[in-house]
Amino acid sequence: MAERFPAYTFHPPALFVASFVTHLESALDGTHLPARTLQTTHKDRPLWVRYDLGAIGDALTKDQLLGRPPTMWRYRELLPPEPGASIVTLGEGMSPVLPCKRLGAQVGLNDLWIKDEAQLPTGTFKSRGLAMALTMAKELGVDRVAIPTAGNAGGATAAYAARAGLEAYVFMPEDAPPVNKYEAALAGAHVFLVNGLITDCGRIVQEGKERMGWFEVSTLKEPYRIEGKKTMGLELAEQFDWDLPDVILYPTGGGTGLIGMWKGFNELAELGWVDADALPRMVAVQSTGCCPIVRAFEAGARFAKPFEDPETIASGIRVPSALGDFMILSALRESGGRAVAVDEGHIRNWMQRAASTEGVSVGPEAAVCVGAAERGADEGWIGPDDRVVIYNCGAAQKYPDVMAHELPRIDKDAPIDWDRIAAGG
């Protein structure tokens, strides 16, 4: 790929000059709701943001994007902020998409790529959704937010709340990765550890709404995180010169990114910017330790049953019950994709394989996608020449306990054993 985004000095994006949002829409039953009031869910299920795509097509061409800064806000016509909105940003967006020839050769794929979201401001893809959610929350008059999180969303919420000047409350399982706990507290959030799962944290946030007066920004409990996450797909299309890959492997917990990308691809198709008959096959990847979406997909169900006793070192996909389960399953089926569960016991190996062959700091969530790539090639549902993109949702450095290795030591006073060094330890 040509270098399309040279180095630049970051400036906050210009104030939005137009908004093409028409309404919000229930993902469950299609009910329309007004867009410019504070909304959460409809019948306890998520909302879509809908746009006047015809007007966007008249106002924007692909070529106009070329002169804009390489952040997710370059797609402002396809995003919800109103004219005059103050954007809450740390420069998020345009993460690199990296060719992985050696890793691809190992798993049997000739055209494997990793889109490395670990390079975003908070070290994870959560930067996108929380930048958008906090922008819209502030625009709509919120001054206090709360979130239940398995880890990474807590740090991102804290960072963007600090950037926005909002008060943040973060609730996470007590066994969440230590880095996630400390980064959220460092950014000034009120952090509480719960001796349970993310669902238990969610119950606390729900019960505290009236007493504490906070607005919940958890996965799919408000409509705007999807819009931030969909920019992963808009970027990918632009980075591949509007020729989308054949397969996207996505580590799936709450599924906001998968849902958002599929929405974005369909919006691009309606604009005529990508081929509507060549959209990617979306693959939701989970661990055998927590795979409610896989079970529902295989059963042909619209909704997933809660997964009992989930256990996985990939904390970001330890989600036993996803609010948007039916939206995930719909995207998989519409795209001709699938849901797969890979062996929990191999996650560390897949992390190391990606890092040692390509130098990419792959977290345990993305590591499951390395396993899925190999399985897809072996089983034939990914062709050897298919263009395949793995989303690396967060840096391995977020998980020091998962990365831990027993390293060989050298006694400074002993003779140096060069044979041992040559053998690698």
Model-derived features: positions:
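PLP-dependent amino-acid enzyme catalytic core
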Residues: F5-G425
